[in-house]
Amino acid sequence: MDEITVDVRNLSKQYGNFKAVDNISFAVKKGEIFGLLGPNGAGKTTTIKLLTTLSPPTSGNASVAGYDIIKQQKEVKRNIGWVSAEIILDDDLNAWENLGLQAALQGITNWEENADNLLKYFELTEFKYKNVGKFSTGMRKKLEIAMALLNSPEVIFMDEPTIGLDVGTRKMLWDLILLIKNEYKVTVFLTTHYMEEADQLCDRIAIISHGKIIALGSPTELKQKAGGYAVSLEVNNGFDISSLKNFHILEKNKNKILIEISSKDNMLDVLRSINLENLKSINLITPSLDSVFLKLTGSTIKETEESVDYRKFYSMVRRNMQ
């Protein structure tokens, strides 16, 4: 039986009449990369704040590393690391001083050896005494992750860690996240609104929308729920469209035809039905997490984000926190 590191039970967070997190439940297995995927404003950051004891829940409960987030907050904090969406380093200090400040804030004693090992592992040793204000974005992210690992946590929470990064730096960070899992044996709880990121990194994903968990499973399991395999054909002018009468044509645009099929094996049925002499190309389109979200919510993540009035939402949150 899998050991559970994060156990969430009917957790809710309400600001006035607005439910930022609405009765969510899930469990994170020890040693996995668990992704909370959803658009901006879906409740991802609020969930992390609840699990890291930065904000109390309105109702429900959870345990992290075996400790109750309400009754055992100090124990929870001692056993977690946290990487925020924004880099939070002191630019006036060097890398070593930032690590020392982190140790002081967390009450970590005898931290120097672990800090040296982390700097070596993340290839930052030669920059140990360099002012971090002169670090590249990638180096700054590396240092922030090293700081999150300084207390040897059981779980590291990463809230939108690659937002705003260029493609190269984002890929570098993906490699670091996999390293954390494989080399440091740390459970990773990751929030993101990037479909590709969740697909590439996560062992399992919970999709959150409007504060509710609407799906949970591995990337493969979620994509299987969406179905939606398709075949894209590019044909010559003499192509006989009637040869596809037994298939559901999703779209026809000049010499390009998109056909829905129930499984990738049905691609052979399409090939058997048509005159191959009039076929220029054929491609199988597999389900994606984008199609999963679209099927579950009726909109894409981008469309969901655009529908949220953030100024109204944050104004309401501030009023209810006063």
Regions found by a protein language model. Name each.
Residues 140, 240, 285, 307-316:
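Short, basic, helix/turn surface patches
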Residues 79, 101, 114, 225, ...:
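Generic alpha-helical secondary-structure signal
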Residues 1-12, 299-322:
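ABC-family P-loop ATPase nucleotide-binding domain
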Residues 228-303:
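Short, charged/small-residue-rich alpha-helical element at the C-terminal edge
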Residues 72, 148, 225, 292, ...:
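Residues that scaffold the ATP/ADP-binding catalytic core of kinase and kinase-like folds
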